[in-house]
Regions:
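Substrate-binding pocket helix/loop in short-chain dehydrogenase/reductase
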Residues: 12, 26-27, 34-39, 123, ...
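Alpha-helical segment proximal to the catalytic Tyr-Lys
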Residues: 55, 101-102, 159
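Conserved NAD(P)H cofactor-binding loop of Rossmann-fold oxidoreductase domains
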Residues: 18-23, 171
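Catalytic loop of short-chain dehydrogenase/reductase
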Residues: 66-91, 96-105
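Short, small/polar-rich loop/turn modules that mediate ligand/substrate recognition or access, typified
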Residues: 104, 109, 161-163
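A short, exposed helix-loop element centered on a Lys and neighboring polar residues
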Residues: 50-51, 97
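C-terminal substrate-recognition "lid" of short-chain dehydrogenase/reductases
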Residues: 142-168, 173
Length: 174
């Protein structure tokens, strides 16, 4: 995939790892396939894509990698209904910091964004109304809030920000 992108458009300046499956199931009801899906969809692509884009970024001595985790993944609190997803997203944070340390000498920054509740239009309004009560800021984040965080980490203003985990949660999960 990386070589196809590079051959068609040239260089890769930034890698944003934002997609990944999510499901809510009690740990004791989790299936081997569901467990595997959480790691194969949330953690493994970040490893493989980071490994694939690193040589080109290192050669140019510049690049940005942004990985999406989840709010409170750094808390190490039991999450019985989303255990596989939670462990994979905690792994994203460890991988982010490791890549940041390895790639910093080459002018490459690697950071994480850990969103809490973001209204992307897919959640039922009644569910969002219940959630907003748990957010200290008093409102649910927007897709625009997420875009602003990504834009910042891609900018020159963030050139010294490396290995960070930017909580995008209105204070929820901290």
């Amino acid at each position: 995939l990386v070589s196809q992108v590079e051959s068609r458009w040239g260089k890769i300046d930034a890698l944003i790892n934002g997609a990944g499956p999510y499901h809510r199931v009690n740990l004791f009801d989790e299936t081997p396939a569901g467990w595997r899906e959480m790691f194969e969809g949330n953690l493994h692509p970040i490893f493989y894509l980071g490994q694939a884009v690193a040589p080109g970024m290192k050669a140019r001595k510049q690049g940005r990698i942004i990985n999406f985790s989840m709010a409170n993944a750094d808390q190490m609190v039991a999450q019985p209904e989303v255990t596989g997803h939670y462990i994979a997203k905690a792994g994203v944070l460890i991988l982010t910091r490791t890549l940041a340390k390895l790639l910093a000498p080459y002018g490459i920054t690697v950071n994480a964004i850990s969103p809490g509740f973001i209204d992307s239009g897919s959640a039922p309004p009644d569910e969002l109304a219940g959630v907003v009560k748990r957010i200290p800021a008093g409102y649910i984040g927007s897709v625009g809030d997420t875009v602003a965080a990504v834009r910042y980490l891609l900018s020159e203003e963030a050139r010294y920000v490396n290995g960070a985990n930017l909580h995008l949660s209105g204070g929820w999960g901290i």
